[in-house]
Each structure stands twice: as structure tokens, then as C-alpha cells.
Amino acid sequence: LLGTAAATVLLLAASSAARADDAAKVLKSMTDYLGSQKTLSASFDSDIEIITPELQKIQFASSGQMKLSRPDKLRVRRTGGYADVELVYDGKTISIYGNNAKSYVQADAPGTVDQMIDAVQAKVGVGMPGTDLLLSNAYDELTAYAIDGRHIGQGVIDGVECEHLAFRTSDTDWQIWIETGAKPVPRKYVITSKTLAGAPQYTLRIKDWKTDAFADADTFVFKPPAGATKADLDSGAIAEFDELPPGTPSGAAK
């Protein structure tokens, strides 16, 4: 009996290790595939949760589109109840336009999309959840602080069969659903903050993936709409570009 129990424990341990290795392998196939594409475009729906001081959970929803041309061009449009924002990067200048505010900010940012994303999040303070999936070193970034990874099984997102992976870090849990087959693109991405009361989540659903070249030469050219005003990057106007409404409690969001 003891021998059987020991064998069972060893089998479970081996199975757990195999599942962890499998999770890393599936994730790597996704990041390698995305990273190898010269151009990418997709549509997305996102939900971000906040926890109020009264411990009520509120969710804000938005939708958008993304177009990427490696290594140095990106265009993202996101529309929600409190923000209608467009980010355009041409390899030299980053432009962020807020349609509700009818104003835009610009900054010199020569380099790659990877460098631009780092600069925006670090210097401007505009959150860009999900952009880590687009980085050229996405696998390293996603797994940098992971303490556990598991291949949970299969799932279906928007009618598409996916592999379901779950990873943990010290302060967040995150899950990703990756399409099976020859094009392993991410279909759903969920980040759960464990250090905040109520464990708020950020959820991203991605669809309409395309890898076609963009025929329009103006895709990554920012043209301020008539009547738009230019705001200073360091001014309070940048708050107009947030995904959350004014007055959201500090620290309440994921």
C-alpha cells in the first residue's frame, strides 16, 4: 500500500512538472509566432475593474483596434464610456489624441515599439495593459516574475478552440487562452491583482487577427483633427487619456 501511495505521489509530481513545461512551451509558441510577424492587426474588447472605498466592485468596458508594423510603428484606438483615445507611433514621434478632450500630446521618441511602450508607461503614466503581448521579447517579459505556470486544459473563446494557461507571480495571477493550430494567437488575457482587496481584474479579448501588410501609407501618420489643441505632456490634460473616469480612487484599479 505504501509503495502504491509513493508511486502515486511521484506520478502526480511528474505530471505537475510536465504541465508546467507544457505551459511554457505553449506560451513560447505564441510569443515566437507573434514576434515573427512583420505586421499585425486585431480588434479587442477590454474590461477593467476597480474596488471602491466601500468595497464595491465596478467594471468599465471599452473596445478598440490595433495595427503594428515591426519594428517601429504602432496605432491603437480605444473607445469606452469615459475615453476615446488614439495612440500613433511612427518610429520618431508618439502622438496621443483624446477625442473627448479634443486635444493631443506629442513627444519625440525615436526607436522601436518596445522602447516606446516602456517610455509611455514609465514617463507618461498611461497604462497599456496587454501591450506586453506585442513586445519582441514578450516571452521573457511575461515570465520574468512567474513563480508557477500551468496548462489548465482547453477552452473556447468566440467559437475558437484555445489552450488555457495560468501563471502566478507574487502579486498577480494571469491567465491566457491561445488559439490552437498553425496560428497560435492570444484570444483572451486576464490579469488578477492579488494585493488589492477584492482582487480586481483586467480582461482583454482579442479577435480579427490579421498578418497582412498595410497598403495605406498613412496608417501610422498622425494628423490632428480640425479644432484639436495641443496639450503639454506634463500637464493635467494627460488625465483625459485614462481608461477610468475622473475621480476614481487612487490604487483602486488593477
Predicted regions: what they are:
Residues R70-P71, V113-A122, V185-R187, K210-A217:
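Short, surface-exposed linear segments at secondary-structure transitions and domain or protein termini
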Residues S15-A20:
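Sec/Tat signal peptide C-region and signal peptidase I cleavage site
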Residues I96-D132:
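Acidic/charged, solvent-exposed loop-and-adjacent secondary-structure segments enriched in E/D, K/R, S/T
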Residues G3-A13:
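Bacterial N-terminal signal peptides
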Residues A226-K254:
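Gram-negative outer-membrane assembly/targeting C-terminal domains
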Residues D21-V26, A42-D47, S95-I96, V105, ...:
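Gly/Pro-enriched, hydrophobic low-complexity segments
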Residues S136-L142:
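Edge strands and adjacent loops of beta-rich recognition modules
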Residues D22-S103:
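N-terminal mature ectodomain segment of secretory-pathway/periplasmic proteins
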